[in-house]
Amino acid sequence: MSKLLDRFRYFKQKGETFADGHGQVMHSNRDWEDSYRQRWQFDKIVRSTHGVNCTGSCSWKIYVKNGLVTWEIQQTDYPRTRPDLPNHEPRGCPRGASYSWYLYSANRLKYPLIRKRLIELWREALKQHSDPVLAWASIMNDPQKCLSYKQVRGRGGFIRSNWQELNQLIAAANVWTIKTYGPDRVAGFSPIPAMSMVSYAAGTRYLSLLGGTCLSFYDWYCDLPPASPMTWGEQTDVPESADWYNSSYIIAWGSNVPQTRTPDAHFFTEVRYKGTKTIAITPDYSEVAKLCDQWLAPKQGTDSALAMAMGHVILKEFHLDNPSDYFINYCRRYSDMPMLVMLEPRDDGSYVPGRMIRASDLVDGLGESNNPQWKTVAVNTAGELVVPNGSIGFRWGEKGKWNLESIAAGTETELSLTLLGQHDAVAGVAFPYFGGIENPHFRSVKHNPVLVRQLPVKNLTLVDGNTCPVVSVYDLVLANYGLDRGLEDENSAKDYAEIKPYTPAWGEQITGVPRQYIETIAREFADTAHKTHGRSMIILGAGVNHWYHMDMNYRGMINMLIFCGCVGQSGGGWAHYVGQEKLRPQTGWLPLAFALDWNRPPRQMNSTSFFYNHSSQWRYEKVSAQELLSPLADASKYSGHLIDFNVRAERMGWLPSAPQLGRNPLGIKAEADKAGLSPTEFTAQALKSGDLRMACEQPDSSSNHPRNLFVWRSNLLGSSGKGHEYMQKYLLGTESGIQGEELGASDGIKPEEVEWQTAAIEGKLDLLVTLDFRMSSTCLFSDIVLPTATWYEKDDMNTSDMHPFIHPLSAAVDPAWESRSDWEIYKGIAKAFSQVCVGHLGKETDVVLQPLLHDSPAELSQPCEVLDWRKGECDLIPGKTAPNIVAVERDYPATYERFTSLGPLMDKLGNGGKGISWNTQDEIDFLGKLNYTKRDGPAQGRPLIDTAIDASEVILALAPETNGHVAVKAWQALGEITGREHTHLALHKEDEKIRFRDIQAQPRKIISSPTWSGLESDHVSYNAGYTNVHELIPWRTLSGRQQLYQDHPWMRAFGESLVAYRPPIDTRSVSEMRQIPPNGFPEKALNFLTPHQKWGIHSTYSENLLMLTLSRGGPIVWISETDARELTIVDNDWVEVFNANGALTARAVVSQRVPPGMTMMYHAQERIMNIPGSEVTGMRGGIHNSVTRVCPKPTHMIGGYAQLAWGFNYYGTVGSNRDEFIMIRKMKNVNWLDDEGRDQVQEAKK
């Protein structure tokens, strides 16, 4: 029947009505509804998440139709919270909601790709050599062939290949490199395993079976806050976001919660309905400032000054004038403030704080015979010297006393915070002051660089009969903050209005924040903590941690929290959120990831030192150690270049090294056999005699640099790679935009410990292999690009510090085109390696140098002074004064069999983490039944790890966080050390065993584990330090308590034994730049900041069409209206940003939210989107890291000293970048460098 007439308004009858005429029956055509129904039809829904470093860890419904992913929406079935707490869902953000666009976009990598010039060389070599290893050798031994493909990296030229061909090439390159130079010349970089832990483990397991180098990430990203290890002996442990709701006062300090913590921001707003006050502290008017009750805008880089001014108020009002019993008792028990510190005399009659008194300093060691040099001393309220339980000396070599019970020598005791009232004299003690250092871009307040303040002291007779004055840390802290104690101290402040360090008036001068605001907020923060017993919280972010002196910023805030008894209390404490660092089932994951089931120890390296060295950034270093030293230090003992300090640290075992030795470690066994020595003895003797050198001492030797590099789950050259242009030149051997001069040309400070060569090696990497699902900046510079499965096409697991759940990535559809999951890719490479290595590598003995690790007895190395064996100051003792030297047996032809099975070391040595261990036989037996076992071959009878799900089951079975039986064993193991019963924390979950299919059904809350410092409970939200405070488990520090005083000799020499305001450093990136020709527009030097962006998670999503549409469609730089007027820049103009490190081009965003003197380029905007050429370099503009360069800090190199000991991603040099300054100007000519003859150069109008 025709419906033609129905389409006309007037040629139809009125339809039947109903509901008293309010409704009408219609007979119109409804065929249009079918298209709507078809659009939203689906065949299935699969749970997955996004393996991106955002900390969100959000569970999503993935809709599949006809074998294709059509869209995604948020899951809403998280386990419910207790009645007084909001639920977690829905969790998600616009970036995550756009991810399905990637799967079928033009950006998707579909096939294995290789650089055309390289594959032509490879195919030609295979025609001449039937052995792939010899074929690769023929290319490597011809400099012209190497140069031919290295110099065109980053300039296109990829062609499609196949998996078999490329696996063979990669394996041959690895075999030749290992055979010729050593396995530590093969390295891999991948970040943040928590976001897809099996994918991470795939690459590091392969590398570890080879003996390759696994590079760290948390320190390199500058997500690692060194202040956390310094204070707590913990990498980072923080409250889950739900605990914000338990807080009564929150300061969001440099953390842009709604923008970078979108899924969690609802807790931040919901808690305000309870009356919680929220404060934003950011230099720019950011998203978080709009959410808060009050906004403070300190000058960027002056956060420690503001924190110390607030600390001054807290100490004066709540510790001295009107002491809070809660604060005093908390500090007495849970901080190092009662501990005694030696005073060392100065020539002028004053003293300088030295190291902490140890039991070994006193007669008979105060009755302590086990590690007395590592046990700190205090005075109790009766005036007696005591050795309180809990210091690091109780942790190793004895059991039952490593706890925070108020006991010393088996007797109840109460420690004294201050010596005032028990003192023998009052002495002048000198403190360094850095706030007077002049910098044209930052405010300073002139004072004597040495401030002498009066302290109460007690005189002790030491074991050698000498008398030594001592002070308590508490008295040192009060003096350091400039508080008047009634001791006739002219340098202390009598009231807040005095402009003396570190009063509110002084803070106003430095930060620009009015002192009345400093006083009010500090008072409110402390008063709330006093009334609620610690429910005041500080949420911190990358904005504060990315400065060179980030540890001073953080220690200032941490001190506020400790003064107020907030750490370890629900709703209180330190909440640092930068990076999805919390891999909750960590101890179950470690054996899988680093092949600890087959070989121990693995080779691990801190990336900051690695890239600083091997991208030759040290050759351009203009910052000297001398300018960083305290005015109280003996400068003659701390001479040299910054890389010298890194080399000394590696030599003494403080830091790892890669490559490690100046020759192939696989050849040492043969030399040792000839000498009749073990490999360990031979290596130690050869190092001591100088016959064998460490590779770090000769970085430009042809055999002492990395040659093969794997990058996966990362955009190293488009996101985290500080010193981008240096990487291009020295690692890759391609064109770069460096505008500075090497030290050789500029007559700068040359290294003392490192051999200087006039010509540095360019193009150190023979092979760069990148795994990704999209064409990223790193892919553009790679030799081989392998297409990985997306997060909706593979099985994996994901956890975060923001919530207590573990949930999966699931293969909703098969990997598209020829992509494969990371596990399958590395399994394929391992199989090719096992085939190719035959005849070249067999069963080999590898000599591995292992640094003095935190959470091991090696953290008790040199207790009182720093002695260097190379200088003859002590003997070379592996594991004590030098790295531990370990001979590791490798079976290279069995690499594939070992990769796909769980090795026997788990049965023999068990498992553990953070200094405790337990038996795992039950779990190994279970995995053999669950995953089945190898039927034959070198791994016969071992549990299979064939698939990613098998790997997930290994993690879940071995981890106390996901296996209640293991959790009980872990708590028992800890209880043997502490002498306390802790199993009650997990007994009720003993029968709970989480499997992969369980988390696919619903996210599961993990089980409380002793390797973390909070509890997973239905009664309390996860809060870091909770078990330390409530279970009396010591912090893993020298004193066993929260460590405010850092007494290592290097910390004291660099003026950082106590917190101090240190202004941003002068990197000289502008002043030491080559002469850049003017372009007719004005130029200005501005501070260059790189906060996290709104339209991407790092570089992911930054080239996603949906996000580009919502943003400006390409790279942008924010500047203030004031600076823009001065530079004749208007909004959306093309500008160029440049300094000695390189140049970048972007559009300007002119905004009143940005203060004058700074510019912001949101971090990791991909260089592949809408970037014209640079007028400075003549090349296409760079990325945000084109104008940065790494500058390591010596105090981050300390090791073998309790909490100041290296651990993978735990402590070490960090890649800061916010002290950089750049020149900015409007571009005159915008040239797109299309080279097609049709492009027009756009000329700007003046």
From Swiss-Prot:
Keyword Electron transport: yes
Sequence positions that bind [4Fe-4S] cluster: 50, 54, 58, 93
Amino acids binding Mo-bis(molybdopterin guanine dinucleotide): 223
Highest taxon listed in the record's lineage: Bacteria
E.C. code: 1.7.5.1
Cofactor: [4Fe-4S] cluster; Mo-bis(molybdopterin guanine dinucleotide)
GO cellular component, one term: nitrate reductase complex
Comment on bound cofactor: Binds 1 [4Fe-4S] cluster per subunit.
Intracellular or extracellular location(s): Cell membrane
One protein family per Pfam: Molydop_binding
Keywords: 4Fe-4S, Cell membrane, Electron transport, Iron, Iron-sulfur, Membrane, Metal-binding, Molybdenum, Nitrate assimilation, Oxidoreductase, Transport
Gene Ontology terms: biological process: anaerobic electron transport chain; anaerobic respiration; nitrate assimilation; nitrate metabolic process
UniProt membrane topology term: Peripheral membrane protein
Catalytic activity: nitrate + a quinol = a quinone + nitrite + H2O
Molecular function GO terms recorded: 4 iron, 4 sulfur cluster binding; metal ion binding; molybdopterin cofactor binding; nitrate reductase (quinone) activity; nitrate reductase activity
InterPro entries in alphabetical order: Asp_de-COase-like_dom_sf, MopB_CT_Nitrate-R-NarG-like, MoPterin_dinucl-bd_dom, Mopterin_OxRdtase, Mopterin_OxRdtase_4Fe-4S_dom, Mopterin_OxRdtase_prok_CS, MopterinOxRdtase_cofactor_BS, NarG
Residue span, 4Fe-4S Mo/W bis-MGD-type domain: 43-107
Family (UniProt): Belongs to the prokaryotic molybdopterin-containing oxidoreductase family.
Protein function: This is a second nitrate reductase enzyme which can substitute for the NRA enzyme and allows E.coli to use nitrate as an electron acceptor during anaerobic growth.
Assembly information from the UniProt record: Tetramer composed of an alpha, a beta and 2 gamma chains. Alpha and beta are catalytic chains; gamma chain is involved in binding the enzyme complex to the cytoplasmic membrane.
PANTHER family: RESPIRATORY NITRATE REDUCTASE (PTHR43105), RESPIRATORY NITRATE REDUCTASE 2 ALPHA CHAIN (PTHR43105:SF2)
Name this polypeptide is given: Respiratory nitrate reductase 2 alpha chain
Organism encoding this protein: Escherichia coli (strain K12)
